[in-house]
Amino acid sequence: MKQLTLAMAVDQCAGFGAQRKPTRREAFLDEMNRLVPWAELCAVVEPYYPKRGSGRPPIALERMLRIHFVQHWFNLADLACEEALYDSLSLRRFVGIDLGSETVPDATTLLKFRHLLEEHKLGERIFAEVGAACCRRAALKSGTIVDATLIGAPSSTKNREKARDPEMHQTRNGQQWYFGMKLHVGVDSQSGLAHSAVVTAANVHDKHPLPQLLHGQEQRVYGDSAYASQKALIRGKAPKARDFTNKRTRRKDSVDEVARRKNRNKSKIRARVEHVFAVVKRLWGFTKVRYRGLAKNANRAFVSLALANLFLSRGRFTAQVRP
């Protein structure tokens, strides 16, 4: 290892230097810092957060919320996040921690904050608040795309209970069997932002949460063939909506080419729902559950969707939020 020079020390301690290039992580955190409505989200959590009393004062709420979002963005467990904050200057800057005068919140503190959000179902309220902020910038249009994605869970019984998670179930997709849960979402057909979500076990059919994924003002509803022939469910929630779900094209040994072409045109719009899943599963890393039970993982899913909406809207709304 090279001897630590003055320039290296300045770079490590302050992050400045003539030869230094801003990293993609720093650029991402700077952009999220501008986009996230911190005051509104803190107002959602504040009624349930510990108040200052005679004992040790609680850590600032916004700081804990920033750390919680860092865990989602970089798919970090509690202990891994604590160590990452000690290791990364860019993360400490985003959170607002100065190691010269204070320490990083430990893993137990992060665990208790997450349990607070789970206990009061604040992940869903954070998702709703971010959705409201996005609606203020770009109102919901007249179409909704509905879809579901599988989130895997450990199927092994080699654990203390010698059993799998009883709230998770298995289902078949094509010729492959999966064990876990399903994340159902409703996405605005114009903006591509998620406005509703439901978490179920994997064996629940896609059509059952359909009414909960509609806001009621739709003119069109898009979905894959799993939602075919569900006009009654759609009109029960959105009376003016037209059914634009994909139709089944194979009849015995023949293929309906007309229906196939129509499905292809619908899928050009329907594909926007995959952008949300790509951010949640590929960028945020939420491909497998981290906790037991649906409630804890649902809280993570709602926060992940809220952050995905902010990420997907960054190009359109960054200019509006810059000082």
What are these regions (language model features)?
Residues 54-61, 292-301:
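Structural motif
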Residues 40, 49, 64, 82-83, ...:
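A detector of single, family-specific signature residues
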Residues 44-56:
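Short, Lys/Arg-enriched N-terminal segment that forms or immediately precedes the first helix
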Residues 1-3, 7-11, 61, 79, ...:
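Polybasic low-complexity intrinsically disordered regions
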Residues 276-279, 283-286, 309, 313-320:
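Hydrophobic alpha-helical segments
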Residues 3-5, 10-12, 219-220, 225-299:
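Helix-centered, glycine/charged polyanion-binding patches within enzymatic domains
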Residues 1-39, 46-47, 319-322:
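Charged, often Cys/His-bearing segments associated with DNA-binding zinc-finger transcription factors
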Residues 63-75:
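Alpha-helical support elements that line or immediately flank enzyme active sites
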